[in-house]
Amino acid sequence: MGSTGRDAEVTRGDFPDGFVFGVATSAYQIEGARREGGKGDNIWDVFTENKERILDGSSGEVAVDHYHRYKEDIELMASLGFRAYRFSISWPRIFPDGLGKNVNEQGVAFYNDLINFMIEKGIEPYATLYHWDLPHNLQQTVGGWLSDKIVEYFALYAEACFANFGDRVKHWITINEPLQTAVNGYGIGHFAPGGCEGETARCYLAAHYQILAHAAAVDVYRRKFKAVQGGEVGLVVDCEWAEPFSEKTEDQVAAERRLDFQLGWYLDPIYFGDYPESMRQRLGDDLPTFSEKDKEFIRNKIDFVGINHYTSRFIAHHQDPEDIYFYRVQQVERIEKWNTGEKIGERAASEWLFIVPWGLRKLLNYAAKRYGNPVIYVTENGMDEEDDQSATLDQVLNDTTRVGYFKGYLASVAQAIKDGADVRGYFAWSFLDNFEWAMGYTKRFGIVYVDYKNGLSRHPKASARWFSRFLKGDDAENKADMN
């Protein structure tokens, strides 16, 4: 368990035939074109107008201009050997006001062009309906994810997407990381629309309506589209693995509780009909309740689980940790070091991201055991580096730490499959350097470097070239790559 995993050897042959390898992005982070194509404002468009909210004062107004460069990007993706692409559809490009009445045909045309070009290049589309870019009008008029009305509006939006794109898109994700929207968007306020730490109950309400909205979208698909289109609809949850800090019972239970407040918060209602008991015990009336009708409605409304995973932590029980409310109420302390003082893994650029490949194997096995071995896709996995303006192009393209990250984590996925977890695919985050939310452009997750100072030109990094060799089965070169 103490091994970093970066010395792991992994080849395409370690995975089953048909296993999907792809890359992932999201609309707000890459598209740009804020005021083009009939698009309405989303909450991030408005949130970033206050430059103090973003580390470098930036926004996604232009981002990396994927809206105008999608053909260049898809051609590069295909040339590297990727055969699947997880992208997100911008809700206000389809319904500028979010109300679900007047479809913006220019928005539909853009995504039709994107999807058709992907398929032409041999790339399978995996479409996310919601990756945090809520139509601003819905936030203003109904309160966004704090209102039960959002469930109906989301279902209308989902139906429009299924109707317009579902003849070609067979893999749908309703919502990306509802935990982040709930906690950072409506609770702490680091993300749009910007809540505040004192309004603790808001994040649990925002989570509640995201679960119901997910179920409503799946219901629409199953009733109106599945028989003809034959696709599948899943939910993407983010989770860091929680490794007990010691063999003490209280630490073992604390680690389980930490997972309840991540995976369990969203998947328990769908698979079992209600929130984890550990959440109910600690939150009381702050945690909304599902009616019996709701419980019946949401049960088993899922075809696959998408897991976004980047890192792991040691978890110890702590009666009153000095942390934000979301962690205080869990009564857990997230620890980065072993008892010996050695860190759990090498740190990437972000202070929260440690390279811990073995954590992913444990997480996949945990999810498989808890939820009856569902179909799982690793829908995001990657690491960031600082944006270093003083570095040469050759230096920034030589991302050997990221190559090691991917080797270790992919080996962990292969091990989980051998353990019996039904993992069907893996998507690297991210294809392109992009707008990294509250961090702006100060962090780079891409396997393709985007030169922000020179026309947003694209340059594949060493990690992209490693992936290309891996996908094309050049195992001998792969094994020599890090020597």
UniProtKB/Swiss-Prot annotation:
Biological processes, Gene Ontology terms: cellulose catabolic process; induced systemic resistance, ethylene mediated signaling pathway; response to iron ion starvation; secondary metabolic process
Residue positions the entry lists as glycosylated: 398
Origin species: Oryza sativa subsp. japonica
Active site: 177, 380
PROSITE patterns per UniProt: GLYCOSYL_HYDROL_F1_2
UniProt KW keywords: Glycoprotein, Glycosidase, Hydrolase
Taxonomy, superkingdom: Eukaryota
InterPro entries named in the record: Glyco_hydro_1, Glyco_hydro_1_beta-glucosidase, Glyco_hydro_1_N_CS, Glycoside_hydrolase_SF
One protein family per Pfam: Glyco_hydro_1
Family label: Belongs to the glycosyl hydrolase 1 family.
Keyword 4Fe-4S: no
EC numbers for this chain: 3.2.1.21
Binding site for a beta-D-glucoside: 29, 131, 176-177, 310, 380, 429, 436-437, 445
Name under which the protein is recorded: Beta-glucosidase 4
